[in-house]
């Protein structure tokens, strides 16, 4: 059994829909968009679970919607209050469980309840009242693997590029075919980690004895051999 299969087995044993990470319920559904009522958005901070921090309603957080036949993966793109309740948050606001916040979700893909295989797009749209959970960091880290996993025991070469959050076992790996199969560009602001990311990719390719043609005008990567 490969390391990725072992990580998936442990995650499956623990479950991917954890009651400790429940975020809210679906209140509105549209093509590739859903709104959820956030039950913990009024709390002054998030929560820690299995070594990682979860906002439970913060912008950018990945979430799971418990559907009838599959689990939907989404991401919180916006959090707001109804216009009539905005005055609740004043200069002395210290948190409240009664805050009626709404999260706007972009639906990204579907996860099979049988083998956790991930496919882009929505197989079946959620229903009003479906429960929503923060996605465990370990599951998000396995998404690239779940898109190509065949179940025949043959694990392809994986380039380890980083990690999701600060949880254990949340390292993200991707196959060279997925990374280099089409145009690949590393973009970001100054100090955003472009050079580090490039160096990481080169290191991983060298580790797996990959062949690279490197045009290094500034000599930044001259120490690689």
Stretches with model-predicted labels:
Residues 156-225:
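Glycine-rich phosphate-binding loop of nucleotide-binding enzymes
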């Amino acid at each position: 059994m490969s390391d990725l299969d072992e990580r998936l087995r442990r995650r499956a044993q623990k479950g991917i829909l954890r009651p400790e990470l429940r975020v809210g319920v679906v209140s509105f559904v549209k093509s590739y968009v859903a709104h959820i009522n956030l039950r913990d958005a009024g709390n002054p901070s998030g929560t820690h679970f299995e070594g990682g921090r979860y906002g439970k309603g913060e912008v950018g957080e990945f979430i799971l919607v418990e559907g009838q036949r599959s689990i939907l993966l989404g991401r919180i793109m916006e959090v707001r209050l109804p216009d009539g309740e905005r005055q609740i948050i004043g200069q002395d606001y210290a948190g409240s469980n009664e805050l009626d916040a709404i999260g706007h979700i972009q639906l990204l893909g579907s996860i099979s309840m049988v083998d956790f295989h991930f496919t882009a797009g929505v197989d079946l749209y959620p229903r009003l009242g479906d429960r929503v959970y923060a996605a465990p960091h370990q599951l998000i880290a396995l998404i690239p693997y779940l898109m190509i996993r065949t179940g025949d025991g043959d694990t392809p070469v994986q380039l380890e590029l980083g990690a999701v959050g600060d949880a254990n076992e949340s390292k993200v790996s991707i196959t060279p075919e997925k990374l280099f199969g089409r145009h690949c560009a590393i973009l970001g602001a100054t100090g955003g980690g472009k050079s580090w990311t490039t160096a990481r990719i080169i290191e991983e390719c060298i580790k797996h004895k990959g062949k690279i043609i490197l045009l290094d005008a500034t000599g930044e990567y001259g120490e690689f051999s």
